[in-house]
């Protein structure tokens, strides 16, 4: 049985329209809450200078990530790895601090409880290294270095950033070499 449609129109006939009348359109930003799709593939980046890998949980097989490389994994696989305590993702504290593998998708990091909307995950990156080398006091530099660089992967990563970044402060580079026991 067909349904009866009733509609109202808000359009004016062309004859009624004033050509000098300004038409305003209200624009209001609407936040669209995206459903958290566990099948969506997201990028995972390794900070390690060596090949890393782990066994998949949700499907058969292994994941192999090349040195300083990336791989695309489903959100479901990442959440499963985190919930099973994979240290490559969870880092030294279980909250993603000083992790070897960094999830480049913010909603997935939030779902894994690695960060919130206001506080980012504690992981080494180029911006943190630049801020470290902008510290004026050598004492503050060393204390920040010791809190920022904890794991073996981070020690190799900071040396890679120094090689690529052309940092000119000899004393700070030597302090990093002494701490990491690696040479630039």
What are these regions (language model features)?
Residues 27-117:
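Compact, well-ordered interaction domains used in eukaryotic information-processing assemblies
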């Amino acid at each position: 049985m067909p349904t009866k449609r009733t509609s109202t129109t808000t359009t004016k006939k062309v004859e009624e329209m004033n050509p000098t009348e300004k038409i305003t359109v209200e624009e209001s930003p609407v936040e669209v809450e995206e459903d958290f799709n566990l099948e969506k593939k997201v990028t995972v980046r390794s900070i390690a200078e060596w090949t890393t890998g782990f066994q998949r949980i949700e499907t058969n097989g292994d994941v192999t990530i090349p040195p300083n490389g990336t791989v695309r994994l489903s959100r479901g696989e990442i959440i499963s790895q985190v919930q099973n305590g994979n240290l490559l993702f969870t880092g030294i504290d279980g909250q993603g601090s000083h992790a070897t593998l960094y999830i480049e998708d913010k909603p997935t990091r939030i779902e894994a409880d690695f960060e919130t909307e206001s506080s980012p995950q504690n992981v080494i990156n180029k911006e943190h290294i630049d801020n470290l080398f902008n510290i004026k006091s050598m004492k503050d530099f060393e204390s920040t270095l010791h809190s920022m660089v904890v794991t073996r992967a981070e020690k190799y990563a900071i040396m890679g950033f120094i090689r690529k970044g052309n940092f000119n402060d000899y004393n700070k580079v030597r302090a990093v070499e002494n701490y990491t026991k690696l040479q630039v």
